[in-house]
Amino acid sequence: MNMKKIVAAFDGLKYSESTRDFAIYIAKQTNTHLVGVFMDDPTYTSYKIYELIAKEGVPEDKLKKLEAKDKLVRDAAAEDFNKACRQAELEFTIHRDRDIAIQELKHESIYADLLIIDSKETLTHYTEKLPTRFIRELLTDTQCPVLIVPLKYKPIQKIILL
């Protein structure tokens, strides 16, 4: 059976080039449609809203500037993925999920043959020991195989399934 759809999951604020490169490599090798899912969860921002409020309250214009900056970063990540897929001459689509990230990703996995995600994915401001809470929660209820990729891309030499 051939794969029909690979999902590559991205945090648009902390874009993983490794996830992009692994996803493109595998999609090209298997001639599979690649879907870049950008988890634009509205509850997750580059700034810590609670710290802003606690310090001085947040003037509306400052908040709008912070939101605009996040949008630019997320848009640049999606554009980088778009450009890389076009260069690789892949069949691909981009989904910008603006709901709760973990729920959307689990839903996307129902229709995927493979999900690719960075091992350090947290969708938080904090670094966590591996596997992260986000990854552990994702693995509990994913409906397809998951490839958790390292920080740096290296071409795949061999695959061992357990």
Across the structure, where does each feature detected by a protein language model lie?
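Short alpha-helix boundary/capping motifs
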Residues: 9, 13, 17, 75, ...
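Generic structural signal for residues in well-ordered beta-strands
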Residues: 34, 92-94, 146
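Gly/Ser-rich helix-loop-strand patches that form or flank binding pockets
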Residues: 4, 16, 20, 27, ...
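Short amphipathic alpha-helical segments at helix-loop
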Residues: 8, 62-66, 97
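Short, flexible loop segments at the rims of nucleotide/cofactor-binding pockets, characterized by
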Residues: 12, 92-95, 124-127
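Small/aliphatic-rich secondary-structure junction motif
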Residues: 1-61, 141-144, 151-162
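Structural beta-alpha unit
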Residues: 1, 41-44, 52, 68, ...
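A short acidic, glycine-rich active-site loop
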Residues: 58-75
